[in-house]
Amino acid sequence: MVPWLRKVITKREKAVADEGQWDRRSLLRGAAVVAGAAAAAPLLGGAARAQAGGGDADALFKAGKFEQAGRAYEEILKKDPTNLNAARQRGYVGLLSNKFPDAEKHLTMALKLAPDDKETNALLADCYIRQDKFSLSVPRWQAAGEDGYAKWFAAFRGEPYQIHGDIARVPWQQMDPSPLVEASVNGGPPKRFTFYTGAPNLSMSATVAKEAGLHAVASQKTDFEGTIIWMYYGVLDSFKLGGIELRNVPVGWSTTESGGDVGTDNDGLIGTWVFYHLLTTFDYAGRSLILRRPTPEAASKVRADAKRAGAKPLPLWLALDHYVHSTGSIAGSGTQVVGVNVGGTGESAAVMPGERAKQLGIRTDYDRPLETFGHSHATTTYPCYPKEIRLGDAVAKEIYCETDPNARINVPWPYGSGIDMWAAFFHPFHKPYNITLDFTNMNVYIARGKAT
């Protein structure tokens, strides 16, 4: 999920899921995130925005032309090895595709140019935690001003996200308003967890955390719509979903100021950090979650199954540590970068900025405004009905969507990916399909019907 596209925020999603604010930094720091806020990253020596061979590397990046942007940044660095923006952005291009040596090389180059640059430090910290190099991430989180994250990841001993088991097929207990599956926490009885790729870490209710014997290694007080909420972060020994068990897992939970649970719709939420350690199929049509150890053999089977189903691989990009992106189209836009949000809740199949809806001539019902929240601030969206929205060969026609006139097309770091967004796809779109996220080969597969 991209930061401006969270449609409905409940206190449960905000605090327990650690994602309702659209960007986890605001919750961990307890800072209010204002829609459209932008941080201007410093450029070494006041260098201008990256230009190469008459083409604008930054414009290529914003447009989602990442390979071309990467080459353009490299050309800049050949001429000017001290260009911080080019080094950092070239590292970011590598990070989007989980090309870790590439990302580390250029982000380390940027770090040497400007050791105190918060954006560089945050990107490099993200690069390390994706590889489970938690200890290396700690000084980078500190330099990025993320003291809570620094304390959290410094608390780990041994290998995080240890995988036991090879495959699990976990049936959904319900589809709506959000999917629920059963999971065991520290060997305890089954608990009801939802899942959402718009959320980062595994999180759970304070009651479940207490039952599991968790203790906090970091905490933060925040104010959500006038309600004081305490966020806690710790280390979970065991999280089991069917035949797959994860050990030594980062986990968060929350309480009201009086110590009570924040919402009771479920017992917790599984975020993208868990899923990028596995090869996961979200089998909407079959109402099940298929989790696999990410081996070459498992990936080969997924590719073969997708080929038989006629599903071509789509690119997968991961921005801001947990926001999944791929390519899709809306109302004849042509192939563009879109957000892909699996799980969660909501009635709209996609959400898009108002400027995009007008640009594409999408029928919008301005007589029926929807008053909701974004970044914990009031906003108003409107129903809209694009003639077609598409992810690969997965298509929905005249389906209910929403548009937000206040949403910006591009939100820079730290509150956005810096990528021009056309739309984000949500829970209702996926219902006729099964969708697989392969974070090793960085592909998305979406096929009609139940997974085989």
Regions found by a protein language model. Give the residues of each.
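Pepsin/retropepsin-fold aspartyl endopeptidases
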Residues: 33-34, 38, 43, 52-55, ...
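N-terminal secretory signal peptides
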Residues: 1-26, 34-42, 46-49
